[in-house]
Amino acid sequence: MKQLFATTSRGFEELLKVELTELGAQEAKVVQGGVHYQADDETLYRTLLWSRLASRILFPLIETKIYSDLDLYAAVSGFNWLAQFDERVTFFVDFNGTNQEIRHTQFGAMRVKDGIVDYFERQGKARPDVDKIQPDVRIHAYLNRENLVISLDLSGEALHLRGYREDAGQAPLRETLAAAIVMRSGWQAGSPLVDPMCGSGTLLIEAAQIEAKIAPQLYRLHWGFDFWKAHNQSAWEKVKNEAIELAEEKQREIQPHFYGFDLDHRVLKKAQKNAQNAGVSHLIKWQQADVAALKNPRLNEVGTVICNPPYGERLGTTPALIALYSVFGQRLKKEFCGWNVSVFSSESTLLDCLRMRASRQFKAKNGPLDCVQKNYQVSERKSDAITDEKELEFNRTSEVAPDFANRLQKNIKKISKWAKQQELDAYRLYDADLPEYNLAVDRYADYIVVQEYAAPKNIDENKARQRLLDAVTATLQVTGVETNKLILKVRQKQKGTNQYEKLANKGEYFYVNEYGTQLWVNLTDYLDTGLFLDHRLTRKMIGELAKGKDFLNLFAYTGSATVHAALGGAKSTTTVDMSNTYLNWAEQNLILNDIEGKQHKLIQADCLQWLEKCDRQFDLIFVDPPTFSNSKRMEESWDVQRDHVKLMSNLKRVLSNNGTIVFSNNKRGFKMNLVALEELGLSAVEISHKTLPLDFERNKQIHNCWMIQHI
């Protein structure tokens, strides 16, 4: 009996133990990352040929403790390698693990290689060559602290390489992982198996090979034991011939009941080719189909739906994935009553969009990703959520977040008509109208932006996440917007300058119309879009006041108020902001509206410092400072409640005799110090109610706005 070790992905050790035992392995013992077992020659070859879960099968040669690289070299060079293979073979060393002495795997591999070739030289033999591509022999070294195990890799190439996959989709599953998913899915051989997002077909191919009794390595041409001196050719031929006969016998019995669907016809062609290579093409039916129109191909039977849908690391944006999983769940409940469902994903929250309760779940790794496989039982009662294909889009909303969907629908009917009359492309459709759906929904031309407000600490995080997913799904259906045109953002309370920090680097800009102006927006790269929608009427008012006046825009952001002032006939405009990014944006807004000339100045500066040094006067000033800022680029912190009087003192100095300051901020509960302003010789009148547009009328505290003049 030989002592062997089968490696596998973490989480599959117990499953592998069961598989090896069924193949005849003795004394199987689970450890992290694999299973130790004993086998005679036939059982050894059977486990190599038939294991669907093992990554490699290793034959340990050296087990010792080492405390230096000299110990490593001595252990290797003192071993009788000629008993395993001769000098004419090529070899390669895989070295895993490090310790205080062997700090790099490449160094460890080099010392093992040196020990092997030096051993052959001492025996008067030629030095065997190293081949990194396709060696005759693979040596596997594993170091854990001072414990060293050096093994002969009898697999050769890793066992997940079945040989049937010539090409894969964008995010393929390893064959060993796919086999484990099938084994854990609850699918029973002989019953229908459907994969509605099959990609390159790995799940179905592995399942079909299981039912057809095709050994996963039946078509492998090269093995790690080909040049092993202990190789038992007769035992190997016996095991392989048994596998060939079993596959041929089983092929005649099986009827096709595997079904693969995918929206991408190109990846389906790859799946068909892979199935042909695997010897199961006659068992699987492939069809191009959208999951939103998924049909049950075996209505009178009960089977299993198995799926590895796209998730965060694979294809699509978050809103698209939310919609995909939601629609998938609805189709399952309509078409697959009484069926088993097994879904594998790295995003447990996306699985919540299925709106089904899992009966079992398993953790697994897909490369570096922590994933989960959840099994469900679809109710035998047909879901009435979708009764008519033609009304698919409308009726979906009645199942997912119906209260939110109804309110959004109502708001759209009211606000869209008003926006059209006002010639507006950008406006708010929903603003936390319902406490349980604490988010905002804005339309920017053909795009929808969903901004989630940070949930209060007393709200369960999972519940808040589920409500967000439901709201996104409902928004997609109610608005009819394409999934790639819905942008999802998480908005938190602003501190300092983090509202200006970059979130992405897509650089996708387009313009929207606002009262005859055109303004650039960017919906993805920053927390804000470049246009504060609640200040729309304020900007319009500035345009109406600006004719023939020298205009100053302080804390200008992207200069949208400057555009209104210039188009309103301002004699000159001065736009000041500390951010070069937003100042460039402001320049592009001016260019977009054909505003040019030396009279329109753009100045990058700390607004407060610039104001203290400014030596000219303005007839109309718009100042919209942040609530708070402690930017490193500012000499002192800024607090609008604390510092607004000092700001007004400096503004008074640059305000012409008949001039007007339009002052606004977003601090809730802001109190203007009217007494201090009067002492400065200024009067202030609050005009907040006049600057609040229809789409923000529910949120009367979103900003406060004041008209300030000399007494």
From Swiss-Prot:
Transmembrane segments: none
Catalytic activity as recorded in UniProt: guanosine(2445) in 23S rRNA + S-adenosyl-L-methionine = N(2)-methylguanosine(2445) in 23S rRNA + S-adenosyl-L-homocysteine + H(+); guanosine(2069) in 23S rRNA + S-adenosyl-L-methionine = N(2)-methylguanosine(2069) in 23S rRNA + S-adenosyl-L-homocysteine + H(+)
EC number: 2.1.1.173, 2.1.1.264
Enzyme class: transferase
Gene Ontology CC annotations of this record: cytoplasm
Molecular function in Gene Ontology: 23S rRNA (guanine(2445)-N(2))-methyltransferase activity; RNA binding; rRNA (guanine-N7-)-methyltransferase activity
Organism domain of life: Bacteria
Cross-referenced InterPro entries: 23SrRNA_methyltr_KL, DNA_methylase_N6_adenine_CS, RlmKL-like_Mtase, RlmKL-like_Mtase_CS, RlmL_1st, SAM-dep_methyl-trfase, SAM-dependent_MTases_sf, THUMP_dom
Subcellular location: Cytoplasm
Keyword list, A-Z: Cytoplasm, Methyltransferase, RNA-binding, rRNA processing, S-adenosyl-L-methionine, Transferase
Domain THUMP stretches: 43-154
PROSITE patterns noted in UniProt: THUMP, UPF0020
Principal location: cytoplasm
Known function: Specifically methylates the guanine in position 2445 (m2G2445) and the guanine in position 2069 (m7G2069) of 23S rRNA.
Similarity annotation: Belongs to the methyltransferase superfamily. RlmKL family.
Stated name of the protein: Ribosomal RNA large subunit methyltransferase K/L
Source organism (scientific name): Haemophilus influenzae (strain PittGG)
Gene responsible for this protein: rlmL
